[in-house]
Amino acid sequence: MPLSTSLLGKKSTYKDSYDVTLLFKIPRINNRNELGINSNNLPFYGVDVWNTYELSCLNKNGKPWVGVGTFYIPTDSENIVESKSFKLYLNSFNNFVVESVKELERIILQDLSNVTHAKVTGRIFPINTKVEFGVPSGKNIDDLDIVCNNYGAPDNSLIEYEDVLVEEEINSNLLKSNCLVTSQPDWGTIVIKYKGKKLKYDSFLKYLISFRNCNEFAEQCAERIFTDIQNAISPDFLSIYIVYARRGGIDICPYRSTDKNYTLPSDKRFIRQ
């Protein structure tokens, strides 16, 4: 289905009963073709981490239960899920009776797997689970005194490097883009680990800031950044992790790595989640 038929940016009615048809799928191949990424031979591994904060159902006695969920959609899935449709889908459980939280988890994972055409994993947690906030790992580059004047299309020509090999981790809280459909702002913290030619921090920060008025989905922004870095410095190793601020009861955190046996960064939330 074309993106114009999705519920993004439109007035919506919340369903009173569980409805899997609310989930709206978006083929990954469309945006990847734009980036020159071969969907049959991806240059990365990883997942999209979805944290959901509006999750409720009824137990067999009609008593409400509330919780939060974390779901992992593999990068090699055929489709992603449009975020507003996922929000409406989750809220369709509000008056739905389930035998247990495990049953709710099973239903959601099965539905997501069917829609994305991949094995989606995840877990649902009770609302009183203790949560600790973390901070981005690596060296923060945000305090550099730079002049910025490019806020249009992302400009990969801004990526410069030094002819010295390094293995390092850097981060920035200044990534911002806009939703492809609604133009609502997506605020992100990006953590980059790489081994290769040393990125020049000042020019790379300008590059990240050039996304400021870019209208793309979170997943496409992540893959654009990954691809641009790869093309610029041909690193021996590269991973990026973007933690987006919560919006509409959901935050989306894409992770991409050249390492097939990757380990996800800490699952501690950052302050904007």
Curated annotation (Swiss-Prot):
It is found in: Cytoplasm. Signal peptide: none annotated. Its EC number is 1.7.1.13. NADPH binds at S83, K84, R247, G248. The keyword NADP applies. GO terms for biological process: queuosine biosynthetic process; tRNA modification. The active site is at C179 (thioimide intermediate), D186 (proton donor). It comes from the Bacteria. GO terms for molecular function: preQ1 synthase activity. Substrate binds at V81, E82, S83, A218, E219. Belongs to the GTP cyclohydrolase I family. QueF type 2 subfamily. Catalyzes the NADPH-dependent reduction of 7-cyano-7-deazaguanine (preQ0) to 7-aminomethyl-7-deazaguanine (preQ1). HAMAP family: QueF_type2. Homodimer. This is NADPH-dependent 7-cyano-7-deazaguanine reductase. It comes from Rickettsia rickettsii (strain Sheila Smith). The gene is queF.
